[in-house]
Amino acid sequence: MQLHPDLDPTEGNCKGLAAWYIEKGHFTNGTNIDRTSNTDNEDANNNSINLADLNVVVSVHAPGHMLTGPKWKIALYLDEKANNDQKDALTKIFTGQAGGEFFIEILPRIGEILGIRSVPIEFNIEGKKKRRIKIPSFVEMEIEGLTGRDPNIESKVVNPAFSNTPGIDPFIARSTRHTYNDHGLEWDNSGKNAFYCRFTYVP
């Protein structure tokens, strides 16, 4: 999600998907998705909920410029593998209730949450540059990183004006497939831009 406040959206509105696979991470009383979590759902003090190996997908529809236009409509998709505590933690994180640099920034832009579903989410990494996400009946997304002058180095956006990975420059990709159909919204962004990277969210 890379934007510039002075450039209007090509089609007059913005619509897309953001997906997260949590390698390792935990939730305490704020957002903390990192690579140092415990292996159980909660730590010895029952104060930290393990979120490792879970997926989250968010659909976003902004009826204008995402930064300066009308507020967004979003829908949240949580990994069905998550237990109730994990679902509650993920909901708080990805709706901005738990804070965190990126989520605090987008919270005022959200006008409506269309729904929160617990669904099977398939996530796959193929080599360095390919990522796939699928939610049966709702989402299909495949992206592939672009090849730069040196094919062994991933091309990236340096210092973007807005990003869902603050402080981390994302790699540039192209969506070979990107379809969505739910909550009365439907689109096909196949062939358009995409981004990916590894990162850490902290409170």
Where are these regions (language model features)?
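N-terminal ordered "arm"
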Residues: 1-27
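A generic short-segment signal for beta-strand/edge and adjacent turn/coil regions
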Residues: 4, 8, 43-46, 102, ...
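A generic structural signal for short, solvent-exposed coil/turn residues
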Residues: 10-12, 48-50, 68
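Domain-exit/linker segments immediately C-terminal to small folded modules
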Residues: 13, 31-33, 73, 87
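A structural-propensity feature for long, helix-poor, extended segments
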Residues: 27-32, 37-63
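Internal, well-folded beta-alpha domain core
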Residues: 51-203
